[in-house]
C-alpha cells in the first residue's frame, strides 16, 4: 500500500526530502471549470466587461500563482519552473469557461500542485472580476488531467 509521503513516523507533517532523487523532466496538466450566466460569459467574450480583459488577467494570475505555489501550500518545494501555460476557452453552449494549465520543469519533484494552483487561481480571478455582475458563479471540477515524469510514472485522468 502507498503511504503519505508528507507524514513522518510520528504522524507529523514534514516536507519530503528530495535531495537524493534524480532530476527528470516533469510535466502536469490541470483544469478548472467556471460556470456563469449566458450574459456574464457574453460580456467577457465580447470584451465589454468594465474591469477590462478578464481572460488576460486570469491567465497572468494563473501563471503568477504557479510560480508562488510553494508560498501558498505549506509543504511544497520552491521550484524553478521552465514553462507555465494557462489557456481559457469559453464554452458558449454550457455557459462555462474551461481553464487548462500546464507546468513543466526538469527537477526532483513533480509540478502537479503548481498546475492545480494555476488553474484554481485563474478561476478565482474570473470570479473576482465578475462578482459585481454575478455572485453565483460556480468554480468546479478542479482536477489533475495528466502528469508525467518521476517515480510514480505517467497518470492520465479518466474522461468526465
Curated annotation (Swiss-Prot):
Catalysed reactions listed for this entry: (8S)-3',8-cyclo-7,8-dihydroguanosine 5'-triphosphate = cyclic pyranopterin phosphate + diphosphate
Protein residues bound to substrate: 75-77, 113-114
Gene3D superfamilies hit by this protein: Molybdopterin cofactor biosynthesis C (MoaC) domain (3.30.70.640)
Keyword set includes Plastid: no
Pfam family, one: MoaC
GO biological process, one term: Mo-molybdopterin cofactor biosynthetic process
Superkingdom, taxonomy of origin: Bacteria
Pathway assigned to this chain's UniProt record: Cofactor biosynthesis; molybdopterin biosynthesis
Active-site residues from the entry: 128
EC category: lyase
InterPro entries: MoaC, MoaC_bact/euk, MoaC_sf, MoCo_biosynth_MoaA/MoaC, Mopterin_CF_biosynth-C_dom
GO molecular function: cyclic pyranopterin monophosphate synthase activity
Enzyme Commission identifier(s): 4.6.1.17
Keyword vocabulary terms for this entry: Lyase, Molybdenum cofactor biosynthesis
Family: Belongs to the MoaC family.
Family matches, as HAMAP family: MoaC_B
Self-association state and partner proteins as the record states: Homohexamer; trimer of dimers.
Role, per record: Catalyzes the conversion of (8S)-3',8-cyclo-7,8-dihydroguanosine 5'-triphosphate to cyclic pyranopterin monophosphate (cPMP).
NCBIfam families the UniProt entry points to: moaC (TIGR00581), PRK09364.1 (NF006870)
Protein name, UniProt field: Cyclic pyranopterin monophosphate synthase
Organism of provenance: Haemophilus influenzae (strain 86-028NP)
Amino acid at each position: 500500500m502507498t503511504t503519505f509521503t508528507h507524514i513522518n513516523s510520528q504522524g507529523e507533517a514534514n516536507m519530503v526530502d528530495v535531495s537524493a532523487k534524480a532530476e527528470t523532466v516533469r510535466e502536469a496538466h490541470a483544469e478548472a471549470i467556471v460556470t456563469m450566466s449566458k450574459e456574464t460569459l457574453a460580456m467577457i467574450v465580447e470584451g465589454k466587461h468594465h474591469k477590462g480583459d478578464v481572460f488576460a488577467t486570469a491567465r497572468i494570475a494563473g501563471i503568477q500563482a504557479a510560480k508562488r505555489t510553494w508560498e501558498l501550500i505549506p509543504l511544497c518545494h520552491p521550484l524553478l519552473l521552465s514553462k507555465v501555460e494557462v489557456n481559457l476557452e469559453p464554452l458558449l453552449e454550457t455557459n462555462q469557461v474551461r481553464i487548462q494549465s500546464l507546468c513543466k520543469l526538469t527537477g526532483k519533484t513533480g509540478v502537479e500542485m503548481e498546475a492545480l494552483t494555476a488553474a484554481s487561481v485563474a478561476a478565482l480571478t474570473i470570479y473576482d472580476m465578475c462578482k459585481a455582475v454575478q455572485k453565483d458563479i460556480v468554480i468546479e471540477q478542479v482536477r489533475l488531467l495528466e502528469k508525467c515524469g518521476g517515480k510514480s510514472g505517467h497518470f492520465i485522468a479518466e474522461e468526465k
